[in-house]
């Protein structure tokens, strides 16, 4: 696997050096690369939608972050320029991963998850605290958020372990279950209930669709629910989020301020929006408008119509992802594709739900929209895995989806 990884890296460098501007163009815009012509059409559509999603996100980030960047750094494009640097790295990561076989990527998943877990543990003695939560560690000028980086490796490793559940030793099962619980517990202690819940949901749903016995699933679900309640009882800021969610207008200038301003932004957009870069709420009324609440700015500037079109993009993305899930004969590949969809689309819907007030404030970023290098790299990683699974779903190896409609349960598809 290491030889293949090195050979692909060397090939990428040779292509860039020999091919000149054409190669640079192809690697920065992989949707234009000739190799994509040989892919399954679903893989090509997923790649096009991924970069459409990214492009919309960069435009919205430019608008949402401009006032804050101008005020803080006297450079309105400060955040966008930094995001573009991370985006270029993410695209290179995307190119590399879509060239690797899934079986090769899975070989590094165990090392990746253990390394990410060790980084997660380092946030306790040497983490940088922001708003009472130590979620980042500094590596020179770069801030690393292990709880974000670990998401792709959780998808990879949980899919691999649960796809082989009946064929692995009891000690190996215990090791990975304890490690998964330790990871979620470490994220929860930071404290970061929303990310811990998302990671737990990923593992639980992958285990569910893999056919793990209901007794174990219900036991884990019960423990998770009790742990979440204990966390809510012990963390004041989490209780305040629930209270502000239930009635933000009761305290519109204190605990309900963030949600009230978000709702005002969404409502101000009406049908067609105020126009690109014409948001009023981003002018220091709506807090963290270029990260957690960037969808509120998007809704204000593009209106209900723009929000509807973006949600339609998510629905199409989800549908194409499910076609990949149902068409691939490999159990581990199906679980991988399902996990990727849950992170990309599920996290997006949670973020949107928070912005419009139907879910409590979580702090989860909107993939490809929210500012943050860790988020953009993790999102590119997850989307590359999904597209790589689609690429490997070759014509001769695909399942006839319509033949599955007569089965009694969707869990039949994962057997």
UniProtKB/Swiss-Prot annotation:
It is a multi-pass membrane protein. The gene is ftsW. Its EC number is 2.4.99.28. The keyword Electron transport does not apply. One of its GO terms (molecular function) is lipid-linked peptidoglycan transporter activity. One of its GO terms (cellular component) is cell division site. The chain crosses the membrane at residues 12-32, 45-65, 85-105, 108-128, 136-156, 174-194, 197-217, 283-303, 306-326, 338-358, 367-387. Belongs to the SEDS family. InterPro entries: Cell_cycle_FtsW-rel_CS (IPR018365), FtsW/RodA (IPR001182). Could play a role in chloroplast division/peptidoglycan biosynthesis. GO terms for biological process: cell division; regulation of cell shape. This is Putative peptidoglycan glycosyltransferase FtsW. The keyword Cell cycle does not apply. Keywords: Cell shape, Chloroplast, Glycosyltransferase, Membrane, Peptidoglycan synthesis, Plastid, Transferase, Transmembrane, Transmembrane helix. It is found in: Plastid, Chloroplast membrane. It catalyses: [GlcNAc-(1->4)-Mur2Ac(oyl-L-Ala-gamma-D-Glu-L-Lys-D-Ala-D-Ala)](n)-di-trans,octa-cis-undecaprenyl diphosphate + beta-D-GlcNAc-(1->4)-Mur2Ac(oyl-L-Ala-gamma-D-Glu-L-Lys-D-Ala-D-Ala)-di-trans,octa-cis-undecaprenyl diphosphate = [GlcNAc-(1->4)-Mur2Ac(oyl-L-Ala-gamma-D-Glu-L-Lys-D-Ala-D-Ala)](n+1)-di-trans,octa-cis-undecaprenyl diphosphate + di-trans,octa-cis-undecaprenyl diphosphate + H(+). PROSITE patterns: FTSW_RODA_SPOVE. The lineage of its organism: Eukaryota, Viridiplantae, Streptophyta, Mesostigmatophyceae, Mesostigmatales. It comes from Mesostigma viride.
